[in-house]
Amino acid sequence: MAGIYLFVVAAALAALGYGALTIKTIMAADAGTARMQEISGAVQEGASAFLNRQYKTIAVVGAVVFVILTALLGISVGFGFLIGAVCSGIAGYVGMYISVRANVRVAAGAQQGLARGLELAFQSGAVTGMLVAGLALLSVAFYYILLVGIGATGRALIDPLVALGFGASLISIFARLGGGIFTKGADVGADLVGKVEAGIPEDDPRNPAVIADNVGDNVGDCAGMAADLFETYAVTVVATMVLASIFFAGVPAMTSMMAYPLAIGGVCILASILGTKFVKLGPKNNIMGALYRGFLVSAGASFVGIILATAIVPGFGDIQGANGVLYSGFDLFLCAVIGLLVTGLLIWVTEYYTGTNFRPVRSVAKASTTGHGTNVIQGLAISMEATALPALIICAAIITTYQLSGLFGIAITVTSMLALAGMVVALDAYGPVTDNAGGIAEMANLPEDVRKTTDALDAVGNTTKAVTKGYAIGSAGLGALVLFAAYTEDLAFFKANVDAYPAFAGVDVNFSLSSPYVVVGLFIGGLLPYLFGSMGMTAVGRAAGSVVEEVRRQFREIPGIMEGTAKPEYGRCVDMLTKAAIKEMIIPSLLPVLAPIVLYFVILGIADKSAAFSALGAMLLGVIVTGLFVAISMTAGGGAWDNAKKYIEDGHYGGKGSEAHKAAVTGDTVGDPYKDTAGPAVNPMIKITNIVALLLLAVLAH
């Protein structure tokens, strides 16, 4: 296995090396005029100030958790938590660092034409993508190799890896929620006063919230998404390894089966690097086609890589599992291929619901012609409808892979889905860069043809941001299911080895709906995503309200802003939003951490351990089911509202300034926190609840 571990670490380092070289290429590009650099500098300053303050707050929470975990489970678990948290933080920070420097270079590149603008924008996204995949794989592989090297086996090997996933998750939920509150507080506030009240266009330098809006794009869509997918990747690989350690306990195949998800990650990272080389504009100037070509090459190369990984690691023949269960290497390979197919299908479905070429978005645009209310009604209808197809795809994947290889087959499917994370994050991080480039072009008064180029790049960026959210949610839902399987298998393992784990003596867990504790667990789990979403939406409403007041005050008290003779105080909005986002993110983020612990001890106090474990397991299922639907409906609905507004701005139903446009702006304002704050933050929330339950089992077993 030493050769496989070496390959996995080399592949992860190749991704980091690719990122470093690409950063060098981007930074060497022309950064435009002094005015463009001044605007970009303000965005850089705001983004750094926000992330520095956010990470300081997270560090305090992280330090407390580190001490508690180390005290309860030992230093290797505490160290695992630290590795997950630090690597997740680095992925988000470096991604943001490059995107706020690439924006001005994309705007300058757009002066040379569409091809140059696309090249720079995608390269900056690819840096974030490869960092996420490389760091996630490296952190899990490195720590696993280290633990094996010091002779850790059984729980001493598994618990530190679970803690690594928890560290990544904790950073992720803060990054997603804090970044989401900032970005949408700025966006909604800027739109309400700028577009609706003052009647000035988007990204107008006269709007005091315009810099905060551009900062928000980076901390939400770039740093937030990076931390989110880093965490999903790390958690899924860890959960798959946990299941491998249980399903192949005490048999020779255990080492190779624990290495298999790492090998899949390694080959798919190399496939993603290859895919980035194929993102080139063709003769038809089809930007989306160029991006999808890169994605398809990555998926095709991953398919070939998975064939090799399967042949070398488990082999295609029969594999002996624990308790005499037989697995087939070929069936596991099919499960991995299904993961690639599910990724493609989820991306296609999300584009259907959020793209301007399809019925859903056009129906919302048409509804805008009859007023604000009908726009909101149709948007809500689409948000609900958009949950059906992804759920059916996930159901089909679960049943097929379970028939092939049981729960371990499902885990391998999710692992191969996430192995494409590098390319998917690249598509996502492309979005905020092009959005910012458009803003810089507008504020620096660049010629109309440059603005047309940045608009074309940005329109595709809107679609890629929506599409990658669909992928992130689908993989998070399936990943959480793997964590739930790890919870039930852990329970069964502790119960079967009662001599070593006396705390589980007499525990009899079943998830029968005739048990009131199971029903209560389902209800409590089901309400968590709604409560969490409500907290996120309320926080954005409050933050946007304070931005509205501040922008109105500046229009009132600083004469000459509207004439363009006086400069607004941009820093005031950035500072206000930073404070608001950090204050508002703490309590919702602690909800999924504390809920499983509180529920377990409350039910334990009322009944017994069996009832408490049953209620806790049911709660995990409840969170997965409602969380998946809440997240899909919010992100797809918000994306449809946003693109319906863009569709009208392209000249349909009266174009900009028409009554339909005003109604569409209202819908977009409602959809903003839906798709960029509450919806995406439900992802890490689902997984944290599951990981805390796994760690609770480890503490009780300890």
UniProtKB/Swiss-Prot annotation:
Mg(2+) 2 binds at N214, D217, D435. It is an enzyme of class 7 (translocase). Its main location: membrane. Its cofactor is Mg(2+). Mg(2+) 1 binds at D187, D191. Changing G185A: No effect on activity; decreased sensitivity to the sulfhydryl modifying reagent mersalyl. This is K(+)-insensitive pyrophosphate-energized proton pump. It comes from Rhodospirillum rubrum (strain ATCC 11170 / ATH 1.1.1 / DSM 467 / LMG 4362 / NCIMB 8255 / S1). The lineage of its organism: Bacteria, Pseudomonadati, Pseudomonadota, Alphaproteobacteria, Rhodospirillales.
